[in-house]
Amino acid sequence: MNEEQPLRIVSLLEKEMSLAGKRIAVLGLAFKAGTDDLRESPALPLIAALLQKGAAVVAHDPIAMPLAMRRADFASVGLMDSWMTALQDSDACCIVTAWPEYQAIHPAEFAKRMRQALLVDGRGIFDPRAMAASGVTWRGVGYTPVCLNGHSIQGRNENG
């Protein structure tokens, strides 16, 4: 994820809803899967931007939670013990780190747990068609909207 992608995620969210007062789940705090390293993590500017827009942010990471709990920049973030509790009653979810446990989430789980099933997939780990079939609005960084069987998805890379 490059430096501009957190702001693109915010832009994609704002095209779907006003962020003020919305509960936004951020899945993945470490800069990459397999580490607890938060340095250079795209989650940091993303969370800061969401909080600035008035969103209530909840987050989960499989191994970076202990470090996140000690950081001042996570003081206003609800740090959840599982992706399931992070998704519960959220208005949107942002995938920031491609952890295997996030990749294994069945699309129906998003629709079942979330208030509004809006997923911004910053890592391109989910199939947009499977998301649409489960009633999830899928937005991906670097994709343009297309329509499939009446469902809006983003299935084509903007760069070719």
Which positions does each model-derived feature cover?
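Structural/interface elements that position substrates and couple domains in central-metabolism enzymes
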Residues: 1-160
